[in-house]
């Protein structure tokens, strides 16, 4: 993948850069109008003066140098004045412009491709890391961020970028290692796991009663549990009371009792052995599991719970990558595996091979390992990475 690289259209990035520059100018104009004066938007000191002294917004946090204008602070203020939302938008687009548009343009090699490097030993969990540049963190949460993917294209004119992504692989691993019958049943039946969990923690009779907000809360609980989240952490994430967050967590363990048993057992075994291990028996040593410092020990305990989950997910996609390359070689295909983004594999596919790839990639990924629940991989394709989503 490093040698092959992925083709990136500089013209698309340049056009996006022009579009973002216009948006930034418009936002600047609006912000200056509301502030009643021009100032340096990139200066926290000047921004703090405008927001908290001139516009009299309530200061939430102070630093050694003055008012904090961090994203966290601005998020809490955005309902109080439209200028705050515009400042947040400005920062977001400016970051995309500088980090991704300008940053990626500098990384395009003479062959028209970007050749990222993958580090196998940077993360403690075993996941691959992409550097020089990092192509695993192209933004997906904002429309402007997603646009960057339009520049990533196939190497042939009528070819495709093909993406195949494991569906909720960490939760499927959790269902497998914990042996929890209720969670396994949900995956075997093909239920939407977040809607299913919402049904359980809100004590509903049917998935039809689950609202989008309930599903969002259940999703935060599902993923939070994997990371050993506390009621305080969940309350902060969801903007709810600690009491309500505790109720969600208690209801979760009531509905999935074997997950609680797994967590207790994972900590106990880590104390006895000094390490946690993945389903492929790859170990992560945890010397801090016996620390006398509560915070240090608690982190090691959460790591004992989480490492077998995240680490096994990393093992699974690496096995899939090895098997996939063998399959491409065996069938003498010209398709190239060009990127790995956590639970997703991305391919550069000639038009003539698309039907073959649509069939074999999900098959190979879903059969990488055998779990007590099915592994599911979802495929999409298009004439660029943006359209393959």
Which ranges hold each PLM region?
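Short beta-strand
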Residues: 39-42, 336-341
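Conserved "right-hand" nucleotidyltransferase catalytic core of DNA-directed polymerases
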Residues: 1-143, 156-160, 167-170, 231, ...
């Amino acid at each position: 993948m490093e040698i092959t690289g992925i083709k990136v259209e500089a013209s698309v990035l340049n056009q996006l850069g022009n579009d973002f520059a216009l948006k930034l100018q418009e936002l600047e104009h609006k912000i200056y109008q509301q502030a009643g004066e021009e100032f340096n938007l990139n200066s926290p000191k000047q921004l703090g003066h405008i927001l908290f002294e001139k516009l009299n917004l309530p200061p939430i946090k102070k630093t050694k140098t003055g008012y904090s204008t961090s994203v966290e602070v601005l998020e809490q203020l955005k309902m109080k004045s439209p200028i705050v939302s515009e400042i947040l938008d400005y920062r977001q687009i400016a970051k995309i412009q500088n980090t991704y548009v300008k940053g990626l343009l500098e990384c395009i090699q003479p062959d028209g491709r970007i050749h990222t490097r993958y580090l196998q030993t940077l993360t403690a969990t075993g996941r691959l890391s992409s550097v020089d540049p990092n192509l695993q963190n192209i933004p997906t949460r904002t429309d402007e961020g997603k646009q960057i993917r339009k520049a990533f294209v196939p190497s042939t004119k009528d070819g495709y970028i093909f993406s195949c992504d494991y569906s909720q692989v960490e939760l499927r691993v959790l269902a497998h290692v914990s042996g929890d019958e209720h969670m396994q049943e949900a995956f075997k039946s093909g239920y939407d796991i977040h809607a299913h969990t919402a049904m359980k923690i809100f004590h509903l009779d049917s998935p039809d009663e689950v609202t989008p907000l309930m599903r969002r809360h259940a999703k935060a609980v599902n993923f939070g549990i994997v990371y050993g989240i506390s009621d305080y952490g969940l309350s902060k994430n969801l903007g709810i009371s600690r009491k309500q967050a505790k109720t969600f967590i208690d209801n979760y363990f009531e509905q999935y009792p074997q997950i609680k048993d797994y967590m207790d057992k994972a900590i106990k075994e880590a104390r006895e052995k000094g390490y946690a291990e993945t389903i492929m028996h790859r170990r992560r040593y945890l010397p801090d599991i016996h620390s006398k410092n509560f915070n240090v020990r608690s982190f090691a305990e959460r790591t004992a719970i989480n490492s077998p989950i995240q680490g096994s997910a990393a093992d699974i996609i690496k096995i899939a990558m090895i098997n996939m390359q063998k399959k491409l070689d065996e069938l003498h295909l010209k398709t190239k595996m060009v990127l790995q983004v956590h639970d997703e594999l991305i391919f550069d596919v000639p038009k003539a091979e698309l039907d073959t790839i649509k069939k074999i990639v999900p098959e190979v990924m879903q059969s990488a390992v055998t779990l007590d629940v099915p592994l599911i991989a979802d495929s999409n394709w298009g004439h660029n990475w943006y359209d393959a989503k």
